[in-house]
């Protein structure tokens, strides 16, 4: 039963892969399929620098589900020439190319070559630069022919400030202008992305037949109804049922979930995760969520912004069985859903830490030389070695279980009031909640931290990352763009600046290299508390100007000299700044009647092998989706 349920849900997850490619950019499916046709069908020399560079480019496109970086959102620069690629495309069997009806190979090249090779065409998937039209300058495929002002006006007209249970406007549609009229093209069966959603529904239907509990059966039925109707009220009903389904050992996310890929933060990318509960590790998160009211009451936030009664925060540690869509191959380590503020305050939220993913990261990080290069002295190294794995997991738990679930909006405040800054402010709020409490004696009392000093490992690595080492993920000359990175720099730079007079945190030089030194850990905690109070105020009151000022002052700009130094030191370590995961492969064993008797799991599939299999077996959408 369990195995069949996991198998059906993983199939439902894999069927959605093409949706995300198309959401990330309208040429992504065409370009991916051209590259795959050349990669598999090219008869020329595959050892030339051009072919090798094309292979790297294709592997990056697979990794980012498109031609823009999955994190920084800048467009990839191909290391191969247009001449090589044109000749290669013309040399393969035309039947393997994504040609539109009546289109020649030459016309196909003409259509997409500027998108691949011209750095000025669609340079950024999500543009967050203040003062620009964020919709027109972003390459993501959530809007077509509309300006930022038109998009904002369209959705503001739909909103009713008096509605206390608003739907997530715009969540599941592309906003387009056709014949001068602005309208939504909804992602649903029979609508946009219908071919993929039909397949997802087919496998969900099978999963419904072997659901573990009546609650889970109801969740799956409601999700199918949402996919079939595209009705956002139905989506809210599904989210409420999902939050309340706490007894199933197997759980899943499948749908349009996070809005980081939309410059206006409304439209959601498609993702899926199938998982089962890690019963032993979940005791840790249940201890935290069981004390949620204590944490809320004692937080350093103004009382008017606190929840009087914390509702249904459920927390668990899970083992991921499959990653898909926007969670594959690079994934989150923790998830807290649903995102609708009113559902969270009325019905609670589900928070998960993905145990097998954090475990893999921890194992990969030990002994790779990174800390030895960037940590100031042996004293900090010993702290990190002793406690960082524990405090890091705890910080994730606190961020997901309590941070996102804490605080409240004042009545009448639009949840989208912070616009483009909303994601960064929300991530900073959750991180600060975790940072403030990871140092609390309450955690030692609950047996969650092994000693009163353990939190120092988290404070040191967090500030080192926010002030310095996360810059390894950014190209020279670029700003910080991604919401999670912006939030970390915002917190670290703000604490550094506000504590400067007392030298709470310093950047010092030793042997010509820059290091972070924390001189007063308790004052750092006080500063985290002060910033948490301010960020909660901004969120609760919908203070757009306050969000703008904080983010633009601390989170965006990079010190070019420090950046160059960090990149130089990192380069010598020969490490990759991002990590992704290959999924296990599930196969069914059937009896003579075709009934499933077992599901086998194998882990021997390579990265390119898996990506090509997915492109073959789960190609659910045409190359152009209008």
Model features per residue range: what roles?
Residues 407-428:
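Post-HEXXH active-site segment of zinc metalloproteases
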Residues 50-382, 388:
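Contiguous, non-catalytic segments that form substrate-binding/exosite surfaces or channel walls
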Residues 213, 391-408, 430, 435:
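Active-site recognition of the HExxH zinc-binding catalytic motif
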Residues 519-626:
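Extended, compositionally biased alpha-helical segments that mediate assembly or anchoring
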Residues 281-304, 308-316, 494-567:
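C-terminal interaction module
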Residues 1-5:
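Conserved small/polar residues in nucleotide/adenosyl-binding loops
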Residues 18-23, 214-221, 235, 413-416, ...:
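Short, glycine/acidic-rich hinge or "gate" loops at secondary-structure transitions
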Residues 435-538:
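Long, well-structured alpha-helical subdomains associated
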């Amino acid at each position: 039963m369990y195995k069949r349920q996991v198998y059906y849900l993983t199939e439902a997850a894999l069927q959605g892969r093409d949706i995300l490619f198309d959401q990330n950019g309208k040429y992504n499916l065409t370009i991916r399929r051209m590259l795959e046709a050349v990669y598999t069908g090219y008869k020329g020399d595959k050892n030339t620098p051009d072919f090798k560079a094309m292979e790297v480019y294709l592997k990056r496109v697979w990794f980012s589900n498109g031609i823009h970086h999955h994190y920084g959102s800048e467009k990839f620069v191909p290391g191969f020439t247009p001449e090589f690629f044109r000749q290669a495309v013309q040399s393969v069997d035309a039947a393997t190319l994504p040609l539109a009806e009546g289109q020649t190979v030459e016309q196909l090249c003409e259509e997409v070559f500027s998108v691949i090779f011209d750095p000025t065409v669609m340079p950024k998937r999500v543009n967050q630069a203040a003062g620009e039209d964020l919709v027109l300058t972003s390459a993501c495929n959530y809007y077509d022919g509309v300006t930022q002002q038109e998009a904002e006006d369209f959705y503001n007209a739909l909103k009713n400030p008096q509605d206390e249970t608003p739907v997530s406007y715009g969540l599941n549609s592309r906003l387009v202008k056709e014949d001068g009229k602005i309208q939504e093209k909804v992602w649903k069966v029979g609508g946009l992305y219908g071919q993929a959603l039909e397949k997802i529904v087919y496998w969900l239907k099978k999963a419904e037949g072997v659901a573990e509990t009546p609650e889970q059966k109801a969740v799956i039925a409601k999700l199918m109804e949402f996919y079939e109707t595209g009705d956002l009220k139905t989506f809210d009903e599904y989210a409420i049922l999902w939050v309340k389904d706490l007894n199933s050992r197997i759980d899943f996310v499948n749908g349009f979930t996070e809005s980081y890929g939309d410059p206006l933060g409304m439209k959601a990318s498609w993702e899926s995760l199938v998982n089962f509960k890690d019963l032993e590790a979940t005791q840790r998160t249940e201890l935290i969520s069981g004390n949620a009211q204590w944490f809320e009451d004692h937080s350093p936030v103004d009382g008017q912004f606190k929840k009087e009664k914390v509702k249904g925060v459920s927390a668990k540690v899970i083992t991921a069985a499959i990653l898909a869509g926007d969670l594959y191959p690079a994934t989150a380590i923790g998830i807290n859903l649903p995102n609708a503020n009113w559902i969270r305050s009325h019905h609670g939220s589900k928070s998960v830490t993905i145990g097998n993913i954090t475990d893999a990261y921890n194992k990969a990080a030990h002994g790779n030389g990174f800390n030895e290069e960037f940590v100031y002295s042996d004293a900090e190294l010993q702290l990190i070695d002793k406690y960082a794995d524990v405090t890091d997991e705890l910080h994730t738990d606190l961020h997901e279980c309590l941070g996102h679930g804490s605080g409240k909006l004042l009545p009448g405040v639009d949840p989208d009031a912070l616009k483009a800054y909303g994601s960064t402010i929300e991530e900073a709020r959750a991180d600060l909640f975790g940072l403030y409490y990871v140092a609390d004696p309450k955690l030692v009392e609950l047996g969650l931290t092994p000693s009163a000093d353990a939190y120092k490992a988290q404070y040191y690595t967090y500030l080192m990352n926010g002030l310095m080492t996360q810059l390894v993920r950014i190209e020279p000359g670029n700003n910080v763009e991604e919401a999670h990175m912006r939030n970390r720099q915002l917190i670290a730079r703000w604490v550094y600046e506000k504590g400067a007079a007392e030298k709470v945190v310093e950047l010092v030089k030793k042997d010509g290299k820059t290091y972070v030194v924390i001189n007063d850990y308790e004052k750092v905690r006080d500063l985290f508390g002060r910033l948490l109070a301010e960020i909660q105020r901004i969120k609760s009151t919908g203070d757009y100007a306050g969000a703008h000022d904080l983010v633009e002052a601390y989170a965006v700009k990079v010190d070019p000299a420090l950046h160059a130094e960090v990149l130089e030191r990192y380069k010598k370590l020969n490490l990759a700044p991002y990590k992704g995961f290959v999924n296990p492969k599930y196969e069914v064993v059937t009896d003579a009647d075709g009934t499933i008797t077992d599901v086998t799991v194998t882990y021997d599939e390579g990265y390119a092998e898996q990506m090509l299999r997915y492109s073959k077996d789960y190609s659910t959408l045409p190359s152009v989706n209008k």
